[in-house]
Regions:
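A short, acidic, flexible beta-alpha connecting loop/helix-capping segment that sits on the rim
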Residues: 423-425, 436-442, 532
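Bacterial Sec-dependent N-terminal signal peptides
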Residues: 1-26, 460
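Long, charged low-complexity terminal regions
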Residues: 369-371
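C-terminal outer-membrane/trafficking sorting elements
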Residues: 13, 462-540
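Short hydrophobic/aromatic-rich beta-strand segments that constitute the beta-sheet cores
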Residues: 60-61, 97, 162, 196, ...
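Residue position within the beta-strands of beta-propeller blades
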Residues: 60, 134, 196, 243, ...
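Trp- and S/T/G-rich repeat-edge/linker motifs of beta-rich repeat architectures
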Residues: 25-46, 53, 65-134, 140-184, ...
Length: 540
């Protein structure tokens, strides 16, 4: 049936966008360290470092720093206590060990999904290859050699292949700490690389090789380095690759012989950088609120007096950045934990996590942290607030604090630091998963945790009816969604799930558009065009 949209047709009235809040929200624990999976493999760990959605599964990287299951901290079983990647197949399943990294890999330093689009020669692949990558370093105390290795998951059989990035001499630790990886295409040569920050050794790169079980052929010489402070983030913004090290933000100059320049420096703040804190943390590309280009969001944590200050860097038009103060977490903590004083705040362990709130249509960024506090009578663990806190940033740059699983009790297990967060990958589940801990050099056996916050889809209240200027059909739909309008031309549209994550986007060029939704899991979604929105149902 062909539908014509004319002035005589009554514009579709639908349930739209005056949504106040998701009132039915509940917390539950998804992972508790110290148990076993269905194959009787031990799942312990002191902290969950990353949570990643990959092909409708949820993966968690788990480390054993300061965990007494590890032989370096008093353990006796050499077959447990090393870094793991665990997997959750559905919300009601139990976590499974997916990768055991092996002896001397104390923790996975990074877990990230990357998408390869080109071969080693710069030619486009027939179809992109989406790969889950983990990486870490392993010190050998017999040979005094440190080996940095990446692991790539084979999704066909669930195994992991390895690729060596680099080897070097002692000491280990921050010299080989691989905290981030990023895909980038050199704008001059057209070659695609995966870049890795390898501690003070510098910036390394590799190319896609499907014949390699580890998927990547790494170049064992640093493209740039050594560095005085380990980099904690690497990002693409405004068509260029950037990374942070200490107080400095570097930009790559592309070409056959690439180089790096400093685009911004926080040295004027006068803080001495403690390498453990790192300086610039959580480097994240965001939309520039003052322009049409990209800006950066970051947390400034230079040393033991860090207050968790968040800055935004906006391009200044001359190759550098203007620095804009956004907030100081220590002040927000003092308001949230009444009567307390936060003498030290460390956060942005990975990135500022972005999602779109489907209720307000607002873009939110989450960032976790830990706080050393005094006063107010709040429960503490080795000086740190015992509960897990995270901050939420709205699109106006305003911040608020929330606590994982509600206010923690004096007898509850310590959560301390929220290190990571990700939207649920599971069809029919509207939830955000959170993970973390951070031993802070204290004994921390089986302290790793994952909580999830559920949003009940049927709990959206204050829904009012408005007339929209567009028609969508069919609704419900299983494969394609058609959009028709007389008035909207060359408008951007977005499809958002009920966690606020953008899952499809595109443009209406003219009066009609066809949107492929076949890959979306069955659920309720919101289609947003300009300042209007409409709800639809995706079916099998």
């Amino acid at each position: 049936m062909k539908i014509y949209l004319t002035k005589r047709i009554v514009v579709l009235t639908w349930l739209i966008c005056s949504y106040s809040m998701l009132n039915a929200q509940s917390w539950s624990k998804s992972f508790t360290a110290g148990g076993y999976d269905s194959d009787n493999k031990f799942l312990g760990g002191s902290e969950v470092l990353q949570l990643v959605n990959h092909k409708s599964m949820l993966f968690a990287s788990v480390g054993y720093w300061e965990d007494e299951n590890n032989i370096w901290y008093g353990g006796f079983n050499t077959n447990i206590g090393w870094g793991q990647i665990n997997r959750l197949d559905n919300p009601s399943a139990i976590w499974q060990e997916d990768l055991f990294m092996g002896a001397n890999h104390l923790r996975p330093e990074i877990l990230k999904q990357v998408i390869f689009t080109k071969d080693q020669f710069g030619n486009l692949l027939t179809s992109p290859d989406t790969v889950l990558i983990a990486a870490g370093y392993s010190p050998n105390y017999i040979t005094n050699i440190v080996t940095v290795t990446s692991f790539a998951r084979n999704d066909l059989n669930g195994t992991w292949g390895e690729s060596e990035i680099v080897q070097g001499g002692f000491p280990a630790g921050e010299n080989y700490s691989i905290r981030d990886i990023e895909m980038y295409v050199d704008q001059q040569t057209g070659l695609e690389y995966v870049f890795a920050t390898v501690g003070t050794q510098g910036i390394y790169k590799g190319k896609y090789n499907p014949a390699n079980p580890g998927k990547i052929d790494w170049i064992s010489t640093a493209e740039f380095g050594p560095l005085s402070i380990r980099p904690l983030g690497i990002e693409v913004a405004n068509g260029a690759l950037h990374f942070s090290s200490g107080s400095k933000l570097y930009r790559r100059i592309d070409g056959v012989s690439p180089s790096y320049v400093i685009d911004h420096d926080f040295s004027d703040l006068g803080a001495k950088i403690n390498s453990a804190a790192g300086g610039i943390r959580g480097l994240t590309t965001i939309n520039n609120p003052s322009g049409v280009d990209d800006a950066f969001l970051l947390m400034w944590c230079p040393n033991g007096q860090s207050q968790g200050t968040i800055y935004r860097l906006e391009p200044d038009g001359a190759g550098g950045f203007n620095r804009i103060y956004e907030t100081k977490l220590s002040l927000l903590i003092a308001s949230f934990l009444v009567g307390s004083n936060a003498s030290y705040v460390l956060g942005a362990y990975n990135e500022f996590y972005e999602y779109i709130n489907p209720i307000s249509n607002d873009t939110i960024h989450l960032v976790g942290f830990e706080a050393n506090i005094s006063g107010g009578g709040h429960p503490i663990w080795n000086g740190y607030y015992k509960g897990g806190l995270f901050a939420k940033r709205d699109s106006n740059g305003q911040y608020s604090i929330e606590e994982i699983n509600g206010t923690i009790g004096a007898n509850d297990t310590a959560l301390v630091a929220n290190r990571c967060y990700v939207a649920s990958p599971f069809p029919g589940e509207s939830a955000v998963y959170f993970g973390g801990f951070d031993p802070n050099s204290n004994a921390s056996t089986n302290m790793a945790w994952v909580y999830k916050k559920d949003y009940q889809v049927n709990a959206i209240d204050d829904i009012t009816k408005h007339e929209t200027n567009f028609v969508i059909y069919p609704n419900p739909s299983s494969n394609q969604l058609f959009i028709e309008s007389e008035n909207l031309e060359d408008y951007e549209f977005n499809i958002i799930n009920l966690l606020g994550k953008e899952v499809v986007s595109g443009r209406i060029n003219g009066q009609t558009a066809t949107v492929d939704i076949s890959s979306l899991p069955p659920n309720v979604y919101i289609l947003r065009i300009a300042n209007e929105a409409v709800k639809f149902v995706k079916t099998n």
